[in-house]
Regions:
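Single transmembrane alpha-helix segments in multi-pass membrane proteins
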Residues: 7-56, 64, 69, 73-90, ...
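Hydrophobic core segments of alpha-helical transmembrane domains in multi-pass membrane transport
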Residues: 22, 47-51, 101-105, 147-156, ...
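Short loop segments and helix-boundary regions at transmembrane helix junctions
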Residues: 29-35, 74-128, 161-163, 219-222, ...
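Loop-to-transmembrane alpha-helix initiation sites
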Residues: 89-91, 117-121, 140-147, 189, ...
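Transmembrane helix-bundle core of multi-pass membrane transporters
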Residues: 100-161, 263-268, 295-306
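Helix-loop-helix "hairpin" substructures at the membrane interface of multi-pass membrane proteins
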Residues: 137-215, 238-243
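Cytosolic-side transmembrane-helix boundaries in multi-pass membrane proteins
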Residues: 155, 173-187, 255-306
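Transmembrane alpha-helical segments in multi-pass inner-membrane proteins
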Residues: 210-273
Length: 306
């Protein structure tokens, strides 16, 4: 039993890393008042772009950078439609998800079944990697796993302990008041949404370059939707996002580990989404949203009064 739990934990961390990247970015985007339902499209485009660039150049780090950039570019498109044009944020995000899924399928046809030109391998940390049990459990992962973990305290500190973090939160709570104090609401929202897209792209890149080093059409398998629920589960807090991402990562791992026990694979495939629906149901309603700390101006377009 102990071995089973340890084996699940060992895989849950890399499995949850794409979710962690996406959630950290979405926390910042929503803290600015912008909901991004295009995360799924940005992640899948990050996955195909990262794999394609790595395949073309043989340099996996160029693939990582390309994955992040394509996520950021798609996010800028979302920012333009939802912040500048003030289009409904749900419609804009859903459109980007459909665009990403369709475009990635078209671009990825040539890479189906192709072996990766390079991949992000595990990095061992001196002394720490040799620790009994803990060494293999926490200190033998690819570089993006460590980057995601390092970003958690950094982003928490920026959000709660810096002037820019206060500015970001004020824009998400009361953009009119922030504007009256001289804050450029549009610029802050653009930056937050762009950052969210970069993180989503990194999450997709991790999928195709490290966790499952290959291109598989639709390989995000709904990860972007889980990110939306995780953002609520984390109560828009980077530290809680770490716990939630690895929890959902463990649930996804259980899909495969429990199949030998005779449990229906269809039921197991539903597990992450059952949890997602439960989180969304628990957060439904204006009273509950306020209680769990949802940004007051989330999904509210802002037009400066002349």
């Amino acid at each position: 039993m102990v071995d089973f739990v340890l084996s699940v934990l060992r895989v849950a961390i890399p499995a949850g890393t794409p979710l962690l990247f996406g959630t950290l970015g979405e926390v910042y985007a929503e803290r600015s008042g912008v909901l991004n339902l295009g995360i799924e499209g940005m992640m899948i485009m990050g996955a195909i772009t990262g794999f394609g660039v790595t395949h073309a150049t043989g340099n996996v780090w160029l693939g990582v950078v390309a994955a992040a950039l394509v996520g950021g570019l798609l996010a800028l498109l979302h920012a333009f439609t939802s912040v500048t044009l003030r289009v409904n944020q749900v419609v804009s995000g859903l459109g980007l998800t459909m665009l990403g899924l369709g475009l990635s399928g078209m671009l990825g046809k040539r890479y189906i079944g192709q072996p990766p030109a390079a991949r992000l391998g595990a990095v061992t940390l001196p002394v720490l990697s040799d620790l009994p049990v803990l060494g293999s459990l926490f200190f033998r992962f690819d570089p993006l796993v460590y980057l995601a973990v390092i970003l958690v305290p950094v982003l928490w500190f920026v959000l709660y302990k810096t002037r820019w973090g206060v500015t970001l939160r004020s824009v998400g709570e009361n953009p009119a008041a922030a504007d009256a104090l001289g804050v450029n609401v549009v610029a802050v929202r653009y930056l937050a949404v762009f950052f969210g897209g970069v993180m989503a792209g990194l999450g997709g890149g991790h999928l195709s370059l490290a966790y499952t080093p290959a291109w598989i059409e639709g390989m995000t398998a709904g990860a972007g939707w889980i990110v939306i629920a995780l953002t609520i589960f984390a109560m828009w807090d980077p530290a809680r996002a770490l716990v939630g991402a690895y929890l959902f990562g463990g649930v996804r791992v259980l899909q495969f580990r429990l199949q030998p026990l005779g449990i229906s694979p269809n039921l197991l495939n539903m597990l992450p989404f059952i949890l997602t629906i439960l989180v969304l149901l628990l957060s439904a309603g204006e009273t509950m949203r306020k209680r769990i700390g949802a940004p007051e101006a989330l999904m509210q377009p802002y037009a400066r009064e002349e």
